[in-house]
Amino acid sequence: SNNDMNILLSYLIIIPAIFFYNILSSINYGWKPHVVHYGAVVLEGSKIPILLVTLVWFELGVFGVIIAITIAHIPGILLHLIYAKQKIKDKINFKFTKKWLKLSWLPGYNSLSTIIMSLDVLIFTIITGSVIGLAFHGAAWLVARLSYNAAIISNAVYPKLLEAKVAGNIIQKNITLLSFIAIPLTLISMFFAKPGLYALNPIYEGASVVIIFMTIRCCIYVYSSAFAQYLTGNEKVDVSENTTFKQYIRSKLFLVPSTRLIQYSGFLITLTLVLMMVFESSTYVELVTYWSIIWALSEVPFLIYFYILVKKNFTFKLEISNLTKYLLIGIISFGVPYFLSPEFLEFNP
């Protein structure tokens, strides 16, 4: 209908706002990574009052949501612009346009693995013919992804590596700090999986085992993504203006997304085969459990691979003793409340 077409066309007004916001955010990420999170807070905080105005006051419906999201980007753009102005004070040199166009495939290739990864939901839905399993998966994912927040700690290393600073000591400290955040968040998700699901909805309580495997995967991914950032941040192939296409193909800027692409493709193939074999004889919770196990196992070899590459490129030493003690203390700290919780919590259907 004409109304639907007008709504689709109105989405075009969001594109410039998102475009400029992401560009300025990327500039700040290279030298002031904390500003990226300031911008996110400003962006999300601006959406709420503007949505109230467009939806409640003016009653604009879907078009009001589009306008609100567009306007909400403006404060975030201004914030990023204030911090980024030191880096964009020179005039735009159009001689770099050819190089930008030549290398425009690289960011797209980097995001291809993420697109491939999202197909697991589609595969599960097609094979099972239902979205019931997705409900259990989504509920478990809300609890399991808590440890993802630890990945923010590694963001500050990337700009330091771009500045060509001595990286070994920086990486060693970053891995330690990353562990200090990731370990407790992981243990919280695992030990309190059942209460977390019960709080969302009692019918999801049976998927608590799913959270354990999802949490393991999230924890592994936090480390593998940090290692990937170390590798790409240390790559200098894009510093020279005369870098050839072949040099980019051989660089870590191409290696890391290619490795992820292989990983996710293998994961999807394995998931498809397993679901086709066990679908008729399994419940939805069991199917989601298989899904989470395959997801976790697919991350392990690539964590090892990225770690080997990091060890080859940097000199650092893991603080195994301190991290082991920290892990044991965390297990005791969260394990005791877990075993005592049945005395104080009742899980009624």
What are the residue ranges of the model-derived segments?
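Interfacial/gating helices of multi-pass transporter permease domains
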Residues: 5, 62-63, 99-103, 121-144, ...
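Interhelical loop/hinge segments that connect adjacent transmembrane helices in multipass membrane
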Residues: 9, 34-38, 62-68, 78-118, ...
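Transmembrane alpha-helical segments of multi-pass transport proteins
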Residues: 43, 113-114, 290-295, 321-349
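Helix-loop junctions and terminal segments of transmembrane helices
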Residues: 29-30, 145-168, 174-177, 228-239
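Membrane-interface junctions at transmembrane-helix termini in multi-pass inner-membrane proteins
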Residues: 16-39, 163, 216-262, 268, ...
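Interfacial segments at transmembrane-helix termini and the short loops linking adjacent helices
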Residues: 1-11, 190-222, 237-238, 242-248, ...
